C-alpha cells in the first residue's frame, strides 16, 4: 500500500501477492493511499479533479467514501486502526490534526 508517481501526479495503490491495484476514486485526478488496518480498510487523500483541494477517503469492501472536515479547504486521512478510528490533517485557516471514528470527531491543535 502506498502511492507512485507517473511523471505527472501521484496515484495510490495496493500490492498483494505481486499484484498491484490502483486505489483511487473514479474520476479523481490523483490519490495517496496512506494507511490500512487489519480489516483491509484503506485511508488516504485524493483530488476529485486537477483544480480541487484534497479530500480524505476510506476504501472498504470495494467502496470509496469521501470525507471533508467541516469548514476545511483540505482534508487527508493518515492512518486507521482496527476499530475504524482515523487520524488526519485538515486546513481550516491553519493546519490541524483530527481524530474521527464511528460517531465522533475531535480536533487536535
What are these regions (language model features)?
Residues 1-109:
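Residue-level hotspots at or immediately adjacent to binding/recognition sites across diverse folds
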Amino acid at each position: 500500500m502506498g502511492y507512485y508517481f507517473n511523471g505527472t501526479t501521484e496515484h495510490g495503490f495496493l500490492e498483494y501477492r505481486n499484484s498491484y491495484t490502483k486505489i483511487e476514486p473514479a474520476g479523481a485526478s490523483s490519490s495517496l493511499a496512506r494507511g490500512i488496518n487489519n480489516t483491509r480498510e484503506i485511508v488516504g487523500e485524493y483530488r476529485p479533479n486537477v483544480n480541487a483541494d484534497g479530500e480524505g477517503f476510506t476504501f472498504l469492501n470495494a467502496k470509496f467514501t469521501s470525507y471533508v472536515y467541516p469548514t476545511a479547504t483540505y482534508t487527508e486521512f493518515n492512518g486507521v486502526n482496527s476499530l475504524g478510528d482515523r487520524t488526519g490533517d485538515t486546513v481550516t485557516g491553519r493546519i490541524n490534526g483530527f481524530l474521527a471514528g464511528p460517531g465522533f470527531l475531535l480536533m487536535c491543535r
